[in-house]
Protein backbone atom coordinates (compact mmCIF):
# COMPACT_ATOMS: atom_id res chain seq x y z
CA UNK A 1 0.00 0.00 0.00
CA UNK A 2 1.29 3.45 -0.91
CA UNK A 3 1.63 6.00 1.91
CA UNK A 4 2.53 9.66 2.00
CA UNK A 5 2.68 11.91 5.06
CA UNK A 6 2.11 15.65 4.78
CA UNK A 7 1.92 17.86 7.83
CA UNK A 8 1.54 14.85 10.11
CA UNK A 9 -1.41 13.41 8.17
CA UNK A 10 -1.01 10.01 6.53
CA UNK A 11 -2.43 9.76 3.04
CA UNK A 12 -2.85 6.23 1.71
CA UNK A 13 -4.68 4.24 -0.93
CA UNK A 14 -7.42 2.96 1.38
CA UNK A 15 -7.64 6.10 3.52
CA UNK A 16 -9.81 9.17 3.50
CA UNK A 17 -9.46 11.84 0.86
CA UNK A 18 -6.86 14.52 1.51
CA UNK A 19 -8.56 17.81 0.68
CA UNK A 20 -6.40 20.70 -0.53
CA UNK A 21 -8.04 24.12 -0.82
CA UNK A 22 -6.49 25.94 -3.77
CA UNK A 23 -6.05 29.56 -2.76
CA UNK A 24 -3.63 30.34 -5.58
CA UNK A 25 -3.53 34.11 -6.01
CA UNK A 26 -7.20 34.61 -5.18
CA UNK A 27 -6.09 36.55 -2.10
CA UNK A 28 -5.45 39.44 -4.53
CA UNK A 29 -2.17 40.28 -2.82
CA UNK A 30 -3.83 40.89 0.55
CA UNK A 31 -2.50 39.00 3.57
CA UNK A 32 -5.73 39.35 5.55
CA UNK A 33 -7.74 37.97 2.63
CA UNK A 34 -5.39 34.97 2.47
CA UNK A 35 -5.84 34.37 6.20
CA UNK A 36 -9.62 34.54 5.86
CA UNK A 37 -9.46 32.04 3.01
CA UNK A 38 -7.29 29.73 5.14
CA UNK A 39 -9.83 29.98 7.97
CA UNK A 40 -12.83 29.26 5.75
CA UNK A 41 -11.03 26.36 4.07
CA UNK A 42 -10.30 24.84 7.48
CA UNK A 43 -13.92 25.37 8.60
CA UNK A 44 -15.07 23.58 5.44
CA UNK A 45 -12.93 20.55 6.26
CA UNK A 46 -9.83 21.10 4.13
CA UNK A 47 -6.72 19.30 5.30
CA UNK A 48 -4.43 21.77 3.55
CA UNK A 49 -4.38 25.16 1.86
CA UNK A 50 -2.16 25.96 -1.08
CA UNK A 51 -0.77 29.08 -2.66
CA UNK A 52 1.30 29.56 -5.80
CA UNK A 53 4.84 30.94 -5.82
CA UNK A 54 6.49 32.41 -8.90
CA UNK A 55 9.58 34.37 -9.72
CA UNK A 56 7.93 36.40 -12.46
CA UNK A 57 11.19 37.69 -13.91
CA UNK A 58 12.37 34.11 -14.25
CA UNK A 59 9.18 32.93 -15.93
CA UNK A 60 8.43 35.76 -18.34
CA UNK A 61 10.45 37.33 -21.11
CA UNK A 62 11.40 40.97 -20.62
CA UNK A 63 8.82 41.93 -23.26
CA UNK A 64 6.11 39.87 -21.56
CA UNK A 65 6.97 41.27 -18.14
CA UNK A 66 6.93 44.88 -19.36
CA UNK A 67 3.88 44.51 -21.61
CA UNK A 68 1.15 47.04 -20.76
CA UNK A 69 -1.69 45.37 -18.90
CA UNK A 70 -4.84 47.40 -19.36
CA UNK A 71 -7.41 45.25 -17.65
CA UNK A 72 -10.16 46.19 -15.17
CA UNK A 73 -8.75 43.56 -12.78
CA UNK A 74 -5.13 44.68 -13.12
CA UNK A 75 -2.98 45.49 -10.11
CA UNK A 76 -0.32 47.27 -12.15
CA UNK A 77 0.32 49.07 -15.40
CA UNK A 78 2.34 46.18 -16.83
CA UNK A 79 1.78 42.45 -16.67
CA UNK A 80 4.90 42.16 -14.53
CA UNK A 81 3.66 44.75 -12.03
CA UNK A 82 0.31 42.96 -11.91
CA UNK A 83 1.94 39.58 -11.20
CA UNK A 84 4.35 41.04 -8.61
CA UNK A 85 1.45 42.59 -6.70
CA UNK A 86 0.00 39.11 -6.22
CA UNK A 87 3.21 37.56 -4.89
CA UNK A 88 3.88 37.19 -1.19
CA UNK A 89 7.46 37.35 0.11
CA UNK A 90 9.19 35.70 3.02
CA UNK A 91 7.58 37.82 5.73
CA UNK A 92 4.07 37.10 4.46
CA UNK A 93 4.79 33.42 3.95
CA UNK A 94 6.13 33.10 7.50
CA UNK A 95 3.06 34.86 8.90
CA UNK A 96 0.79 32.57 6.89
CA UNK A 97 2.71 29.50 8.05
CA UNK A 98 2.28 30.58 11.66
CA UNK A 99 -1.41 31.28 11.10
CA UNK A 100 -1.96 27.91 9.42
CA UNK A 101 -0.31 26.19 12.40
CA UNK A 102 -2.47 28.21 14.78
CA UNK A 103 -5.73 27.14 13.11
CA UNK A 104 -4.61 23.57 12.42
CA UNK A 105 -4.40 23.43 8.64
CA UNK A 106 -1.37 22.38 6.60
CA UNK A 107 0.03 25.04 4.28
CA UNK A 108 2.19 24.51 1.22
CA UNK A 109 2.63 25.97 -2.23
CA UNK A 110 3.18 25.28 -5.90
CA UNK A 111 6.68 26.18 -7.06
CA UNK A 112 6.68 27.32 -10.67
CA UNK A 113 10.44 27.77 -11.04
CA UNK A 114 13.79 26.97 -9.45
CA UNK A 115 14.13 30.08 -7.30
CA UNK A 116 10.57 29.69 -6.00
CA UNK A 117 11.34 26.09 -5.09
CA UNK A 118 14.45 27.26 -3.22
CA UNK A 119 12.40 29.97 -1.47
CA UNK A 120 9.82 27.42 -0.31
CA UNK A 121 12.48 24.92 0.76
CA UNK A 122 14.15 27.55 2.96
CA UNK A 123 10.78 28.01 4.69
CA UNK A 124 10.64 24.23 5.28
CA UNK A 125 7.32 23.75 3.52
CA UNK A 126 5.93 20.29 4.32
CA UNK A 127 5.28 19.46 0.65
CA UNK A 128 5.51 20.80 -2.87
CA UNK A 129 2.75 20.93 -5.45
CA UNK A 130 3.74 20.63 -9.09
CA UNK A 131 1.55 22.33 -11.68
CA UNK A 132 0.33 20.19 -14.58
CA UNK A 133 2.24 22.45 -16.95
CA UNK A 134 5.46 21.33 -15.25
CA UNK A 135 4.74 17.60 -15.43
CA UNK A 136 7.32 17.32 -18.23
CA UNK A 137 9.78 19.76 -16.60
CA UNK A 138 12.18 17.07 -15.43
CA UNK A 139 14.91 19.55 -14.37
CA UNK A 140 12.44 21.33 -12.04
CA UNK A 141 11.02 18.03 -10.74
CA UNK A 142 14.55 16.75 -10.06
CA UNK A 143 15.49 19.97 -8.28
CA UNK A 144 12.41 19.84 -6.04
CA UNK A 145 12.89 16.11 -5.36
CA UNK A 146 16.31 16.93 -3.89
CA UNK A 147 14.54 18.64 -0.97
CA UNK A 148 13.22 15.22 0.13
CA UNK A 149 9.67 16.50 0.70
CA UNK A 150 6.44 14.99 -0.61
CA UNK A 151 5.52 16.15 -4.11
CA UNK A 152 1.96 16.25 -5.39
CA UNK A 153 1.84 16.23 -9.19
CA UNK A 154 -1.05 17.61 -11.20
CA UNK A 155 -1.44 15.46 -14.28
CA UNK A 156 -4.02 17.36 -16.35
CA UNK A 157 -3.12 17.20 -20.02
CA UNK A 158 -0.38 14.66 -19.38
CA UNK A 159 -0.14 11.15 -20.78
CA UNK A 160 0.54 8.07 -18.66
CA UNK A 161 4.05 8.14 -20.13
CA UNK A 162 4.47 11.70 -18.79
CA UNK A 163 3.15 10.66 -15.38
CA UNK A 164 5.41 7.61 -15.18
CA UNK A 165 8.46 9.63 -16.27
CA UNK A 166 7.73 12.31 -13.66
Question: Can you describe what each PLM-predicted range is?
Answer:
Residues 1-20:
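N-terminal amphipathic alpha-helix/helix-capping segment at the start of soluble metabolic enzymes
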